């Protein structure tokens, strides 16, 4: 997708994400009510270095956030492998590794009780952050587990509970859908001679076709509006000493400014999604705050070049894994980005399929703080049905294409969790993010 801004970058940085929802009078020249209404207030310093040109094929920025100024260049970028295998059998008298209560089984890789299992799952899905009022050293038992949530969550992690094992309700539904599709495909291949009535493939209704055309047109329209903003992003440093303080600060500014442009473009595009502006303002903000990084990663995957294993954000300027590391990103975040981008590239999705995937990601009712979950589910279902019909028509000989695409949204949830760890590392390093990014990613100073 090309996500987009109407106005050039002003000189004032927004104090919060809510300022992105301030509306301006609609231009009478806009057609069909598709005006990109955005109170653009992000500060982008005028580049003093070489201006980077941008074309229509230019890539979208992603939330690539430096971790520390003095991070050395890695020599190996290999993720640690985790051992897999069945959980040991239980004898019936095992105790929870977190609080000492009676264990009910192995949950998220740890022998634990139902209470700690549910607590860990809720904490991960909501992205909860707790505060201990006793210095962070509370002894954990069945009594204290109710008194100190921070120490309980820490004990869960120390015991070995893994966030990537947590599935949201949406992920469970998508996995069930994929399993049903695979079983159906297997049954078809095993008994091809059994006569059966021809399968009725979904058809695109005129309303669905019009909606898809509107989304693709919005992509193209808003892509043209964002060029001037990217031109004003601090350029990537070309300095004799790449490890100098000035070069490190310039790389940090480069990526954070790209992230600001991306967030503003996502807001701009979301306002053109049918049904989005009918939600309450609070639900609009709640949906975008947690889906922004997933949309950024989808956009990043569109710019992946498998030949050079690089990602192009600006015209004639590509970033490989080493460039990401020089900017301060952790290896644990770099490698999943490239692996996800490679997997998405193999699907060879077109503009319409990307636009629908992004809409489905935005309309996720299980996001934290969403009030009207039923309405959000209805809106998401509209886009899921449109994608199913579209894929069935464009990939008639690949019945697994649709579930494969939806499973990428599950992968995005895992990547989003890794991104949260990257942002938390910034907080520990006392790196100052612009106010907009701090609020979007809940970095509380």
Swiss-Prot record:
Post-translational modification here is noted as: Ubiquitinated. Ubiquitination by UBR5 leads to its degradation: UBR5 specifically recognizes and binds ligand-bound NR1H3 when it is not associated with coactivators (NCOAs). In presence of NCOAs, the UBR5-degron is not accessible, preventing its ubiquitination and degradation.
Q: Which GO terms describe its molecular function?
A: chromatin DNA binding; DNA-binding transcription activator activity, RNA polymerase II-specific; DNA-binding transcription factor activity; nuclear receptor activity; RNA polymerase II cis-regulatory region sequence-specific DNA binding; sterol response element binding; zinc ion binding
Q: Which CDD domains match?
A: NR_DBD_LXR, NR_LBD_LXR
Report the residues modified as Phosphoserine: 191
Zinc finger map (NR C4-type): 96-116, 132-156
Question: Which GO biological process annotations does it have?
Answer: apoptotic cell clearance; cellular response to lipopolysaccharide; cholesterol homeostasis; fatty acid biosynthetic process; hormone-mediated signaling pathway; lipid homeostasis; lipid metabolic process; mRNA transcription by RNA polymerase II
* Any one Gene Ontology cellular component term annotated for this protein: chromatin
Region Disordered: start and end of each range?
A: 1-34, 63-86
Spell out the subunit comment: Heterodimer of NR1H3 and RXR (retinoic acid receptor). Interacts with CCAR2 (via N-terminus) in a ligand-independent manner. Interacts with SIRT1 and this interaction is inhibited by CCAR2.
Assigned protein family: Belongs to the nuclear hormone receptor family. NR1 subfamily.
The name of this protein is: Oxysterols receptor LXR-alpha
Organism of origin: Mus musculus
| Gene name of the encoded protein | Nr1h3
């Amino acid at each position: 997708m090309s996500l987009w801004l109407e106005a050039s970058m002003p000189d004032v940085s927004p104090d919060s994400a809510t300022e992105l929802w301030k509306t301006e009078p609609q231009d009478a020249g806009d057609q069909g009510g598709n005006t990109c209404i955005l109170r653009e207030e992000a500060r982008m310093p005028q580049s003093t270095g070489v201006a980077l040109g941008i074309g229509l094929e230019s890539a979208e920025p992603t939330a690539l956030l430096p971790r520390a100024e003095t991070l050395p260049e890695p020599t190996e970028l290999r993720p640690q492998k985790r051992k897999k295998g069945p959980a040991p059998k239980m004898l019936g008298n095992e105790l929870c590794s977190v609080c000492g209560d009676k264990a009910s089984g192995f949950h998220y890789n740890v022998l634990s009780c139902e209470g700690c299992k549910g607590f860990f799952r809720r904490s991960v899905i909501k992205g909860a952050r707790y505060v201990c009022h006793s210095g962070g050293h509370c002894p954990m038992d069945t009594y204290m587990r109710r008194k100190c949530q921070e120490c309980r969550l820490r004990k869960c992690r120390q015991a070995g509970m893994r966030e990537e094992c947590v599935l949201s309700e949406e992920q469970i539904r998508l996995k069930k859908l994929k399993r049903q599709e695979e079983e159906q495909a297997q049954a078809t291949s095993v008994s091809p001679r059994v006569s059966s009535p021809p399968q009725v493939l979904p058809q695109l209704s005129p309303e669905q076709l019009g909606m898809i055309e509107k989304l693709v047109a919005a992509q193209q329209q808003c892509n043209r509006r964002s060029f001037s903003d990217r031109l004003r992003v601090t350029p990537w440093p070309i300095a004799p000493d790449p490890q100098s303080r000035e070069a490190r600060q310039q790389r940090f500014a480069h990526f954070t400014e790209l992230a600001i442009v991306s967030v503003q473009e996502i807001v701009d595009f979301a306002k053109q999604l049918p049904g989005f502006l009918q939600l309450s303002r609070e639900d609009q903000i709640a949906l975008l705050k947690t889906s922004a990084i997933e949309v950024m990663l989808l956009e990043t995957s569109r710019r992946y070049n498998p030949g050079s294993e690089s990602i192009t954000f600006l015209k004639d300027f590509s970033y490989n894994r080493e460039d990401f590391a020089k900017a301060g990103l952790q290896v644990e975040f770099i490698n999943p980005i490239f692996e996800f981008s490679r997997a998405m590239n193999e699907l060879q999705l077109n503009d319409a399929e990307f636009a629908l995937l992004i809409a489905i990601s935005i309309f996720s009712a299980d996001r934290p703080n969403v009030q009207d979950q039923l309405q959000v589910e209805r809106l998401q279902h509209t886009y899921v049905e449109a994608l199913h019909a579209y894929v069935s028509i464009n990939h008639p000989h690949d019945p697994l294409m649709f579930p494969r695409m939806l499973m990428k949204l599950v992968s995005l949830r895992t990547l989003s969790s890794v991104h949260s760890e990257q942002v938390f590392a910034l907080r520990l390093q006392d790196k100052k993010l612009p106010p907009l990014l701090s609020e979007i990613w809940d970095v509380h100073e």
